[in-house]
Amino acid sequence: MGRKKAHTSFKGKQPGPSPQQRHLSAAKRNELNVLCEKLFHLSSNPAYVTQSWNNYLDISEVLLKVKRLEEMKTETSQRSQGIGQFVNWLTENGARVDGLSVVEFSGYDLGLRAETDFTENELIMEIPRGLIFSTYTAASELLVLQNDPLVQHMPQVALAIALLIEKYKENSKWKPYLDMLPSSYNTVLYMKTNDMIELKGSPTLEAALKQCRNIARQYSYFNKVFQNTNNPVSAILRDVFTYERYW
């Protein structure tokens, strides 16, 4: 995936589970693994491509069971509580945000508010390159997956795994930033079946079904990877990787 190779090698003790990790029982883990195998088959078999709607319904049924099993492992937090820590983190790491504040706008979400008048073409914000989250600036552990086909050829997948690594490893320097990220987005992955039905007859339906299928395949694939390999990434994500956290 084009990452620089000047990273420290990972020898010796691997990262242990973070305080945020909660283990599934062996029985529930086995049940989840079986569901993931079924999910991978449904989302990978080319025979289902010509039956995209029925395939979507089958995938949704399996995912509902998956999310019920993983529900106990999903936490929520109030993003606005981390604003002060986030702004301090920015300035301590060289960002310039004078005259701006992060606020919660009623009926919307978090955003930037000007606390002073700015002239036309005036620079209002300056963010160092080192504070731009990417697979080059974060999650050096990802190097162990550099030959994984999904990580290697799909930059958005590599970035998603990098975000999870930094979120769940101990003492991540990116924690103030990650705590500010939204917990949900307005995409087809958050739509219920009844919502998807409304897209029938629209040219966007096929793209939406394909997106849902792709994410289901990626999730089931990485679930198997993290459960069956021993490396720094699996040590961090094995017990915290869930469908909802991934998508």
Feature annotation, model-predicted:
Residues P15-G82, N88, D98, F105-Y108, ...:
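SET-domain substrate-recognition elements in eukaryotic SAM-dependent protein methyltransferases
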